[in-house]
From Swiss-Prot:
Residues 1-44 form the F-box domain. SUPFAM superfamilies: RNI-like (SSF52047). It comes from Saccharomyces cerevisiae (strain ATCC 204508 / S288c). This is F-box protein YDR131C. Interacts with SKP1. Component of the probable SCF(YDR131C) complex containing CDC53, SKP1, RBX1 and YDR131C. Pathway: Protein modification; protein ubiquitination. Keywords: Ubl conjugation pathway, Vacuole. One of its GO terms (cellular component) is vacuole. Its main location: other. Coiled coil: none annotated. Substrate recognition component of a SCF (SKP1-CUL1-F-box protein) E3 ubiquitin-protein ligase complex which mediates the ubiquitination and subsequent proteasomal degradation of target proteins. Probably recognizes and binds to phosphorylated target proteins. One of its GO terms (biological process) is ubiquitin-dependent protein catabolic process. InterPro entries: F-box_dom.
Length: 556
């Protein structure tokens, strides 16, 4: 039946089903195989770590992208025989992809339109893939998110057809050396080979205010990724007079009417900041001319990563970018959660339009883990959700399994808290949250520095077992996968007031990530909205939703 659908209907279905279902369709019949294969190869996300499906929406990210599919290997588990490491498995899967292209290059390579790289892809395999694409990839238009110059070298034969350009850095990580003339010559050659009239996205690791001094008319790009590096701020060979540099702004280089997406990523360490006498970290905003972006009124997506927080800069961005729909704030150092910031955002024009918000901030809560050396310290559950589910988790999991030696919530040895601190273990030590880039509409979730929840459970139980004093012959029960999910849900309930600020202030918000925890904002009824987790969602019930009844129902 599926293979008999008109192509236009088939096409609409294909764009709405995840990769797993697309693969299943290849086995239905020959016509179905031939119809679905272009949708599998059109947009490729080349990952070097395992992909994770969400249980709230298992299609998240893979309706648009196709990923390299492989599982996580728990290399530290002595009970499991592992024939290879995660890194080795990733290379093998990547090489299988290369082999598949090599077997049918004329049929498969022309199907590829977009490739998203990740930084640590095996360089040798990537070189071979690019050789195939340079010869047969006639429809390849977009290749992005890479930092190695070798990728640009492989893409040179396709320069005129590409709509993306990455001006890679002189070295992977910033150094204290000045930029060499040979590096600048390479960048010059890249730019000369590129058709700037076709360019839609530019990623640059060099000071644009100095490098692009003779571009002529502004580039009509849609997306700009600006990397701030201490080693590419000053370009001696491109320096002009001070008077000229003061006049040059980003609006002279990029067309303000076309730029829609702006990502600013700082590579500065604390040691690289200007001294207090020179203006401190605020001086970086001035040196890179970032205030010049306030003249770009059509920005719809703004990402600020690894910068030091500047209230002045952010507030002006929110006030000027009336069309802002996507916002990411991931600052270096201290950035406290501030209700006044969200209130300010809600009063701006963009506050009514914002759909996706990713924020990393300090919530300044200590939960029940005491910050004291007092040998007799009581566990404190004040502020926790009073619902029956949370009460059950506290009594059946926390008190009976994690702190079985406590009496009346009294702790005997605070020095061993870190092994018992399941929140720290869950979100920092053995993270269960995959990296979910909600500001990219269709980006799949990846387990960069996270582990499956089963691995977290094993490691937490091992840490717990090694620290529990069992002098009273107390039965030590290991936590289970279900217990771990209950602890995660307990934490989400604890954040009720934080979620409520966003839910009530930003009426069109669809996705919200707080400190790496991705959620979907759903409309419960005509009056209420709530955040639900994208991962480990099964069994979750929001504690911010109330049953609404009318007078008739109340007294019937």
């Amino acid at each position: 039946m599926f293979d008999k659908l008109p192509y236009e209907i088939f096409k609409q279905i294909a764009w709405r089903i995840p990769q797993e279902d697309k693969i299943s369709l290849t086995y239905v019949c020959k016509r179905s195989y031939e119809s679905i294969i272009p949708f599998i190869y059109q947009n490729l996300f080349l990952n070097e770590t395992y992909h994770i499906n969400g249980d709230y929406d298992n299609s998240f990210g893979t309706c648009y992208w196709s990923v390299l599919n492989f599982h996580y290997i728990d290399e530290d588990d002595s009970n499991t025989k592992n024939d290879m490491s995660n890194r080795r498995l990733a290379k093998v899967k990547f090489s299988y992809f290369e082999r598949t292209l090599a077997e049918s290059p004329k049929r498969l390579c022309p199907l590829i339109n977009r490739i998203r790289c990740t930084w640590h892809l095996n360089e040798d395999v990537m070189t071979n893939v690019l050789k195939l694409l340079s010869e047969y990839g006639s429809n390849l238009k977009f290749v992005d998110q890479f930092v190695r110059s070798s990728v640009n070298k492989g893409l040179e034969p396709l320069s005129k057809q590409l709509k993306t350009l990455t001006l890679t850095p002189p070295t992977l990580m910033p150094t204290h050396n000045s930029v060499s003339g040979s590096y600048l010559n390479k960048i010059d050659r890249l730019l000369l080979k590129c058709d700037l009239s076709r360019l839609e996205k530019l990623s640059i690791h060099i000071n644009a205010l100095k490098y692009f001094k003779n571009t002529g008319s502004p580039m009509k790009i849609k997306a700009l990724v600006l990397n701030l590096r201490p080693d590419t701020l000053n370009l001696a060979e491109y320096d002009a007079s001070d008077d000229f540099l003061k006049e040059l702004e980003y609006i002279d280089i990029f067309d303000a009417s076309t730029l829609r997406q702006l990502e600013i990523l700082s590579w500065y360490s604390r040691d690289d900041f200007p001294s207090g006498e020179e203006g401190g970290f605020d001086r970086l905003y001035v040196k890179w001319g970032l205030e010049g972006f306030w003249k770009f009124p059509n920005i719809e997506k703004l990402s600020l990563a690894s910068l030091v927080y500047s209230e002045f800069f952010l507030m002006n961005c929110l006030a000027v970018f009336h069309n802002l729909k996507i916002l990411k704030l991931d600052y270096m150092g201290k950035f406290d959660f501030d209700v006044s910031l969200i209130n300010f955002l809600s009063k701006q024009v963009c506050g009514k339009k914002l759909q996706r918000f990713d924020i990393h901030c300090q919530l300044n809560h200590r939960l029940f883990f005491p910050m004291t050396d007092n040998p007799l310290t009581r566990l404190n559950f004040d502020g926790f959700c009073p619902c029956s589910t949370c009460k059950n988790t506290i009594h059946e999991v926390i008190l009976k399994k994690i702190f079985p030696e406590t009496r009346s919530k009294l702790l005997k040895n605070p020095n061993k808290f870190q092994a018992h601190n399941f929140f720290y273990q869950m979100f920092f030590e053995n993270k269960i949250m995959p990296y979910t880039n909600i500001i990219d509409n269709e980006s799949p979730a990846m387990g960069w520095d996270s582990v499956p929840i089963e691995t977290f459970v094993r490691k937490f139980n091992e840490n717990l077992q090694s620290t529990i004093e069992n002098t009273e012959n107390i039965t030590v029960n290991k936590i289970t996968r279900e217990d771990a999910i209950s602890l995660y849900h307990l934490y989400l309930h604890y954040l009720k007031d934080v979620f409520k600020v966003f839910e009530q202030s930003l009426p069109n918000l669809e996705y919200l990530t707080i400190n790496g925890i991705p959620t979907k904002i759903i409309q419960v009824d005509e009056l209420q909205r709530c955040a639900v987790p994208l991962f480990y969602n099964n069994g979750y019930k929001s504690n911010s939703v109330y049953e609404l009844v009318d007078a008739e129902a109340l007294f019937s």
